[in-house]
């Protein structure tokens, strides 16, 4: 056991985690050169295309160190995006140490900080690594000082490497073997294994990634899930060397995969403890804290026949993604679907794309909203995650919106732009600290403004240099109203949005204008209105298409023309009564872009 090292790699987006993982795998001979490809661990097509890591992946490698010993390295590559930070905290729970990778050109960024604090809270040994030293812009001395200044760990002798060229990667491994402690645990005690991650395989059922904390797990053992008390047979187990390799046992301190032929998706939840049925452990390991979704959106299948397969797909996906929340919902405009909760907009996009790709579904998404806390006049408190669930205005005593605490790190040059942006987003500054050339800003900004497009706008006002990390702080009373959209005097529930009263007029007007461009012209006039309660705040009309009925009259009599026009008018009137308007998917997404283009 003293030769096992469990660690994960944490860093900000694009600081080179996945590339470093590739080099480590290559040096330790996990894959032959022929099988080696860029970003081996980003196994989803989606991860490759966007160049980001979404799921944490684990690998077991053997490394022969300079002291002659062979060490078993179990390492986990983690995502860097703030939307996937729960993936990071789960991976860290399975480790004794973490490599903090910092780009020697960019320096410390907000996510570096957030992930590093998560690791320190879990009492992990953090080993700083300066990556990308082959870049002409690299300044390792400055960045080492920055790490000490901002993060507060000693980085004077931080390992310097370039994952792209492979320089210094062996030093990283040597340092890691030296500094990260071996796992603690009792190899002879009763079995306790923590489920770090699970996914669904069509042939094997549920596959779980486990970290053995105490005891040993052998193939063929009877295994008990501690939260449900159900027992299963350990049919197959093994490790990833990125390839799936079968083993006969997993020893104390190791990380590996396990197949127990669990067909029920909820059979082995992530964060649960597995123990042996014969000699069970007394208590479960501390799991993970549940993450609360920050953004909710309705997902509906385009054709209602897909509802069943959509439900199964969501079930399988939520096994793999512990933070996805969903409950059935129906909408008068879109039929049956699900209300899903996500950690952020990127998370929502990824889930939607995964559902469409991996499970072949066609989906319509409604605009995302955050959760509001409503105190009714009867002094009840309810939580509303969809505009259609908002009680009537005269029943609301107070409406409170969620406030996010945003930590931003940015170069001084862009401070003015960023502060202007935060004020425009109704932000309140709570702190500002200068670290050398960097400024650490803390603002309290309404969550609704943060999840909408704050990140994109922050990046564009600071030319990509600012970085953001946010978390939910509290609910705060605010003057929010619901803007409804009426099409031909009928409310479309999927188009409603909740916004601040000061912005309501503008948002309503913009939304109506956007709708006008997006709804195709019909044979009759379509009236689009935005309303707060019964008060109409904006209106616009999509003009009808009409045939020129007079084309066949040469010069003819005026009464003849009048008769034809009158006939056409009556036809249109009849059509308008029975006609219904098909809304394209773009119309539902238009709400997202309200407030973006006029800045």
Swiss-Prot record:
EC number: 3.6.5.n1
Domain (tr-type G): residue spans on this chain: 2-184
Subcellular localization(s) per the UniProt record: Cell inner membrane
Keywords, ordered alphabetically: Cell inner membrane, Cell membrane, GTP-binding, Hydrolase, Membrane, Nucleotide-binding, Protein biosynthesis
Family annotation (Pfam families): EFG_C, GTP_EFTU, GTP_EFTU_D2, LepA_C
Catalytic activity: GTP + H2O = GDP + phosphate + H(+)
Origin superkingdom: Bacteria
GO terms of biological process kind: positive regulation of translation
First-listed, main subcellular location of the protein, grouped into a coarse class: membrane
Record: residues binding GTP: 14-19, 131-134
Gene Ontology terms for molecular function: GTP binding; GTPase activity; guanosine tetraphosphate binding; ribosome binding; translation elongation factor activity
GO cellular component, one term: plasma membrane
Classification via Gene3D superfamilies: 3.30.70.240, Elongation factor 4, C-terminal domain, Elongation Factor G (Translational Gtpase), domain 3, P-loop containing nucleotide triphosphate hydrolases, Translation factors
Topology of the protein relative to the lipid bilayer: Peripheral membrane protein
Enzyme class: hydrolase
InterPro entries: EF-4, EFG_III/V, EFG_V-like, EFTu-like_2, G_TR_CS, LepA_C_sf, LepA_CTD, LepA_IV
SUPFAM superfamilies noted in UniProt: EF-G C-terminal domain-like (SSF54980), P-loop containing nucleoside triphosphate hydrolases (SSF52540)
Function as written in the Swiss-Prot or TrEMBL entry: Required for accurate and efficient protein synthesis under certain stress conditions. May act as a fidelity factor of the translation reaction, by catalyzing a one-codon backward translocation of tRNAs on improperly translocated ribosomes. Back-translocation proceeds from a post-translocation (POST) complex to a pre-translocation (PRE) complex, thus giving elongation factor G a second chance to translocate the tRNAs correctly. Binds to ribosomes in a GTP-dependent manner.
NCBIfam families named among the record's database cross-references: lepA, small_GTP
UniProt record similarity statement: Belongs to the TRAFAC class translation factor GTPase superfamily. Classic translation factor GTPase family. LepA subfamily.
Protein name (record): Elongation factor 4
Organism, as annotated: Salmonella arizonae (strain ATCC BAA-731 / CDC346-86 / RSK2980)
Gene name tied to this protein: lepA
